[in-house]
Every structure is written in structure tokens, then in C-alpha cells.
């Protein structure tokens, strides 16, 4: 049965939930502001959300974990420094050292950004963050579980997104990556032709050394990619996700709904912007629990306009495939609400769903 068929004054109650979401977003933005991963501000927002969830659920717990919040975006600075040095050293005749630095930059980028590994974490200061876990028990024993998720922290400002939106962001990153590939090819050619530690006297590869200098401004620009002193309010990314998960619990409670054998959870993760650290901590701690009981995870992130709303069937820059059964379930839910939600891929970055 659809909720619209079984709940009296359905539209009014949905509107009430929408108003609740807007009120909660405004409250956190005004009273807390930006919420750096693992910061007191992140915890303050979570404490408020936990207090709200206690009204609608049977239990609310905090699960703490350690993280290194600046490690995730630290790869950008490392790549910039390594590539500036690589280009200079190549032109001075130290192609082997240049190659090593290029590979260091490439490995940091792949491990941290494409694979979201905790690769650079030991080199950065440690903090403590937490996940908020609210549970609404079913009627009868737990045979199934559905988790609604949003992340509580907000990101450091990305300067080029602020200045030119997604197009400038992609251009800045793409130009730097092209430069890295060009330098890598030149370094391999130098080693293959016996110029590992000697400069080219002339010819094509000598000219390519000068061509690489064109990318120096690009590498300098990515050093300023992240505004480390400015944490954005994160009303869209991702208070919208948090309050959607909270609104599910409120709606169920307000209407006296308990599913038979299906437990409902709201998991409000910390430190997503630091490389999905909260989601990773939850998945690690609850791994066996999720395998023993059929579990569905629905991650809400940046719920804005209907025109931009989608079901993301691929994540982590397209490298992770989300379960198509859950995607189809969300597709059906959208149809019940009169929305034809397309399947899309997270083309740059990732979400807790990954």
C-alpha cells in the first residue's frame, strides 16, 4: 500500500515534514555554521540531531572513530609540489628523480581520491569524529533492515568551484592531470634512451622539456584548490541528507508506523568530506551485522531541485557500482511520488553509499 492511500491528510503531513526539514537546516546553519570534519561544530550539530531523533526512535547512540581530516584533500597539494619539482628536474637532466616524484603524486591521487584509501592519514593530525545511529524497532524480530543516511559535516571551500562552478573545477583538475601524463611519458622516454641522470642535448625530448613548463601555472593553481580556513555552511551538502533521514523517522513516529520485521535506522555519519571516513567506520564495525540480516542502505546527498535529482547507480568517480535492486526500488519510490528519476554516475568524487 502506498503511504498516500493509507495515511489520512497525507499531503498535509508530507508538507509538515518538508517544513520540518527546512526549519532544521536553518537552525543548524544559524546556530552551528560550518562543520569541519571531526570538529566541535560537527559534534554540536550531531548532538542537536540526536536530540531530535530521540523524539521519534527507540534508541540513539554515538559511535566514535579516529580520522585525519586534512589527509583526504592533502593529495592535491602533494601532486602540485611533486609536479613542479618533476618538470624542473626533468629539464635539469634528472629524469629518474623526476619520474619518482611524478609517481609519488600519481599514487597519492589514485589512492586518496579514486580509491578513497587512508593512504596519507599517518602524515596528518588526528581527530575524533562520530556517527549518530538512531533505531526504530519493528514489530516482531528483525529480519530486514533499511538505513537512511546523510552526513553531518561540511566541506572546506573549493576555490575554483566557488569562482567558476563545476566547469572551472573540472578544467583545473583535467589540465593538471594531462600535464602529469605528458611529464610521465617524457620521463619514461628519457630512461628508455639512456638519459636517466643526464640532460638531452637537443631533439624532440629536449623540446618536450620546455613544453612541460607550460603546466607550471596549472600546478601552482592547484596548490590553492582548497580554502583550508573556510568551511562552508553545507545547507545542501549535506544537511539536506541528514534532515531527510530524520524526517523519515518523524513521519513514521507521527503516524504510528512500525514495519513488520523491518528495522529502520537513521545513520548520520561524520566526516564524509574527509574521504567517507564515517561511512567506512560504520561499515567496518557493522560488517557482520549487515551480512547476517538483509540490509538496504540509502544515502541522501545534496537534495536540491527536482531537475537535478537522480538515483546514482555508480559512485566513486564511476568506479563503484551500486546495487541495481536498491536503485530500482528508489526508482519505483520516485514514480509513486510522481517523479521520473534518472540513473546517473557520480562523475567526480564519491558519497557514503560507495
Predicted features by range, described:
Residues 1-41, 47-60, 71-75, 136-137, ...:
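N-terminal hydrophobic or amphipathic helices/low-complexity stretches enriched
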Residues 20-23, 27, 44, 48, ...:
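Extracytoplasmic/secreted proteins, especially bacterial periplasmic and envelope-associated proteins
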Residues 26, 342-354:
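Zn-dependent metallopeptidase/amidohydrolase metal-coordination segment
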Residues 34-137, 159-206:
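A non-catalytic alpha/beta surface segment that caps or lines the substrate-entry region
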Residues 60-62, 266, 341-343:
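Generic structural signal for residues in well-ordered beta-strands
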Residues 102-133, 141, 154-159, 189-321, ...:
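Acidic/histidine-rich catalytic neighborhood of metal-dependent amide-processing enzymes
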Residues 138-145:
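Proline/glycine-enriched tight loop/beta-turn segments at coil->beta junctions
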Residues 151:
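Histidine-centered divalent metal-coordination motifs
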Amino acid at each position: 500500500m502506498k503511504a498516500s492511500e493509507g495515511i489520512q491528510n497525507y499531503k498535509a503531513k508530507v508538507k509538515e515534514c518538508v517544513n520540518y526539514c527546512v526549519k532544521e537546516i536553518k537552525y543548524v546553519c544559524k546556530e552551528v555554521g560550518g562543520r569541519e570534519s571531526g570538529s566541535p561544530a560537527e559534534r554540536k550539530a550531531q548532538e542537536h540531531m540526536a536530540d531530535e531523533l530521540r523524539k521519534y526512535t527507540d534508541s540513539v547512540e554515538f559511535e566514535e572513530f579516529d580520522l585525519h581530516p586534512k589527509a583526504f584533500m592533502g593529495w592535491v597539494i602533494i601532486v602540485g609540489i611533486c609536479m613542479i619539482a618533476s618538470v624542473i628536474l626533468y629539464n635539469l637532466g634528472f629524469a629518474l628523480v623526476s619520474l619518482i616524484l611524478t609517481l609519488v603524486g600519481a599514487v597519492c591521487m589514485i589512492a586518496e581520491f579514486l580509491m578513497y584509501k587512508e593512504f596519507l592519514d599517518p602524515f596528518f593530525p588526528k581527530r575524533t569524529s562520530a556517527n549518530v545511529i538512531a533505531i526504530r524497532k519493528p514489530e516482531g524480530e528483525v529480519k530486514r533492515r533499511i538505513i537512511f543516511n546523510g552526513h553531518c559535516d561540511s566541506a572546506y571551500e573549493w576555490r575554483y568551484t566557488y569562482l567558476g562552478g563545476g566547469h572551472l573545477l573540472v578544467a583545473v583538475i583535467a589540465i593538471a592531470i594531462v600535464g602529469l601524463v605528458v611529464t610521465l611519458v617524457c620521463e619514461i622516454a628519457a630512461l628508455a634512451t639512456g638519459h636517466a641522470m643526464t640532460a638531452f642535448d637537443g631533439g624532440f625530448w629536449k623540446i618536450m622539456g620546455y613544453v612541460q613548463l607550460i603546466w607550471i601555472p596549472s600546478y601552482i593553481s592547484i596548490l590553492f584548490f582548497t580554502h583550508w580556513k573556510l568551511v562552508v555552511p553545507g545547507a545542501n551538502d549535506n544537511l539536506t541528507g541528514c534532515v531527510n533521514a530524520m524526517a523519515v523517522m518523524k513521519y513514521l513516529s507521527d503516524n504510528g508506523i512500525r514495519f513488520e520485521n523491518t528495522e529502520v535506522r537513521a545513520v548520520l555519519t561524520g566526516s564524509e568530506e574527509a574521504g567517507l571516513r564515517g561511512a567506512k567506520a560504520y561499515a567496518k564495525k557493522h560488517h557482520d551485522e549487515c551480512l547476517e540480516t538483509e540490509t538496504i542502505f540509502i544515502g541522501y546527498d545534496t537534495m536540491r531541485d527536482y531537475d537535478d535529482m537522480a538515483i546514482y547507480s555508480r559512485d566513486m568517480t564511476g568506479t563503484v557500482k551500486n546495487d541495481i535492486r536498491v536503485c530500482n526500488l528508489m526508482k519505483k519510490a520516485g514514480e509513486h511520488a510522481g517523479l521520473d528519476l534518472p540513473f546517473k554516475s557520480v562523475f567526480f568524487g564519491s558519497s557514503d553509499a560507495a
